[in-house]
Amino acid sequence: MPILFGCMSNHNELPHERAQFTSFQESTQEDWSLIMRQIGNTQDMVADNALHLLRQLGNDHGGFPVSRLEHSLQTATRAEQDGRDAQYVVCALIHDIGDTLAPFNHPYIASTMLKPVVSEANHFMVAQHGIFQGYYFWHHIGMDRNARDAFRDSPYFDYTEEFCVKYDS
């Protein structure tokens, strides 16, 4: 599976050089040149940071029958076994990565991470899967199970619905 987050480096050796301003208004072109040179180090850590967040899901089940990590692995495995491409499988793997950080808006954490490197369809699917999934249980908790209908005109409605039915249930 290709790494979608850039190449990984030894980020244990971060450069010590730092900009000198105390507010953006005081910053200089030299400060920003330094920051832009070093931003690659931060970008190189994205994959490791995502894997760390994914591993943390193993510590929480939230009352569900399996841990959030097991669920993520099951979702990705189902998608892979169904012949989905690598990008889709990665989306399936990390779609709930924000669950322990922001349970009620977790889809937006994963979709924000993925947006620069995935298709529009996959981004929409990850961003909206929580609302689409609500169709199957929101009526049990006093919410509108048909909230997903607000996206009925989206070209990705069926795509996202299929993700929830086949892989994220």
Residue ranges of predicted features:
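Metal-dependent phosphohydrolase cores
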Residues: 2-93, 97-169
